[in-house]
């Protein structure tokens, strides 16, 4: 309640709450706990007026090599929470992650896979499109067009060469090899009306810098490289 009040008082828009997901687990108790955790996340997203709950769906359970089984756990978990999400008015935004994170963070690796799940889940589901995770996909343009109004969030940053860490070495827009304006044009052309291209920087290097200076650089690059 305190957080929701402060957000309202500041006149802020909560584009999304990150994150839900992490459904795969080694046993039934773990899977049930993940579902309950996601139900709490839905309630939190509703309380703060978030436009969506971003889903990082989860990787392989410890010791497992069963990729198909993990994806089935994700599917089952999502189906289990959709009624609560619809009742709360919270869009469940599936975020495909780069394949290099498939083992430990998300077995959902392409926009096409995410949209296939959205087709199953129906109303109240959508996708969170992060250029860091999808820029490499040769089918990206077709899948963005397919997504259309189901794009619930749009995240931007850059892929550095070389990349030292697949999670915590993102670049600011313009630092790497992603054609961000081209992808933004696809997203806008598909009908995304969220109004925001959110700069999402997970970077040990940038976190070590002065926060005000980093924010100023983000603003500059958002105006010139996004």
Language-model region placement:
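Glycine-rich, flexible loop/turn motifs
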Residues: 19, 103-104, 169
């Amino acid at each position: 309640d305190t957080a929701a009040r402060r957000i309202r008082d500041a006149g802020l828009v909560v584009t999304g709450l990150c994150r839900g997901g992490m459904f795969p687990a080694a046993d039934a108790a773990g899977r049930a706990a993940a579902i309950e955790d996601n139900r709490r996340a839905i309630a939190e997203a509703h309380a703060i007026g978030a436009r969506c709950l971003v889903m990082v769906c989860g990787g392989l359970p410890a010791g497992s090599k069963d990729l198909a089984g993990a994806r089935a756990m994700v599917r089952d978990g999502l189906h289990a929470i959709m009624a609560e999400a619809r009742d709360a008015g919270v869009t469940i935004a599936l975020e495909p992650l780069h394949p290099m994170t498939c083992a430990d963070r998300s077995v959902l690796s392409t926009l096409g896979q995410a949209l296939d799940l959205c087709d199953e889940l129906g109303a109240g589901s959508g996708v969170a499109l992060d250029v860091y995770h999808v820029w490499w996909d040769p089918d990206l343009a077709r899948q963005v067009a397919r997504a259309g109004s189901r794009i619930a969030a749009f995240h931007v940053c850059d892929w550095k060469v070389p990349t030292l860490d697949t999670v915590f070495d993102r670049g600011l827009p313009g630092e790497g090899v992603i054609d961000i304006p081209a992808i933004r044009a696809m997203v806008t052309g598909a009908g995304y009306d969220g109004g925001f291209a959110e700069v999402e920087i997970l970077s040990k290097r940038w976190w070590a810098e002065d926060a005000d200076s980093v924010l100023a650089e983000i603003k500059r690059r958002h105006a010139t490289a996004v």
